[in-house]
Amino acid sequence: MRRFAIFAAVLIVIVGIGSQPWNAGGASGWRGFLNSFRAHAKHADQRDGRAIATSDGWVIRDCSGQDKDHTNWGWGHQEHACEVRTITIAKPDKLDVSSMNGGIHVVGEDRQDVHVEARVEAWANSASEAADILREIQIETSGGAIHDNGPNFHLGHQGYGINYVIHAPRQLSAELKTLNGGIELEHLNGDLKFDTTNGGVDLVDLAGDVRGSTVNGGLDISLSGDKWNGKGLQAETTNGGITLNIPDHYSAHLETGTVNGGIEVNFPITVQGDIKHHLATDIGGGGPTIHAETTNGGVTLSHGSSTGGDGDSSGGENSES
């Protein structure tokens, strides 16, 4: 089956260039032929159910037959192509991830390396056009930086998106940026910065110095343990609500507010003055500041059991009292 697929790919390439002289374009003509052959052979292997290992360390498998991911973009009646790319890299001094279209999800684990899974999806008017777009998308990993590059589109009938799921050590310094997509951080302790324009933010069981914002999206924050370990948390949104889940018997200095919206507190606290749009108080024995605010949206504060486990924010060599 694989031999037949590769043979078919060779025929496709030869037919495509058969009307031109073999020496057309000189060396570049031969390079174009070889690149086309490799691309068709790679996708023939993928359609045959095989994962492809690339020379730069990525492993690629086809996911075009699976359900389309509607997380960050819509498909309409367009055709799509999909592949999952994975790579494992050494733990960097700082993890720097940036993307135009797609979410970034980083999970802290008991490990010493960083495993990256990128689900790359492209859409166009035809399946072949979508597959061509996939082949143009590059993901670069160098010195802890993970950046993607692809073609620019000005019309909605063509495009692509990349959703990252990254498994990293719990002790981590990271900066995450995306334009169109959500950001999720779980079970991490360190200097963590995040920024998205169009997407929600989920923060679960974190510690250290955590700062970031979204323009269009909500904030969902779940604290763990009995206090914040580290400098504190500062998270902001312009258009979106805030949900803050605080464990019983938690100690921190809490600040939250909204311009156009209300504040709902589902547990007893002691405050001075009106809390209609702004709240600042110590809970428990006080401590580092937990700051979360929105311009347009409501704020809900709830009590619940700690979300922590082995990775809760009360531990870690980089934490501060």
Please describe what each predicted stretch is:
Residues R2-D113, E121-S126, A130, H154-G161, ...:
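Short acidic/polar N-terminal linker immediately downstream of export determinants
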Residues D45-D48, N180, E184, D191, ...:
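Asp/Glu-rich intrinsically disordered low-complexity tracts
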Residues D67-D69, W73-K94, G103-H105, A130-D195, ...:
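Right-handed parallel beta-helix
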Residues T88, V210-T214, G218-S321:
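Short, surface-exposed interaction patches in beta-rich subdomains
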Residues E109-R111, S142, K227-W228, H249:
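Short strand-connecting beta-turns/loops that link adjacent beta-strands
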Residues D113-V120, A252-L254:
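A compact, surface-exposed functional segment
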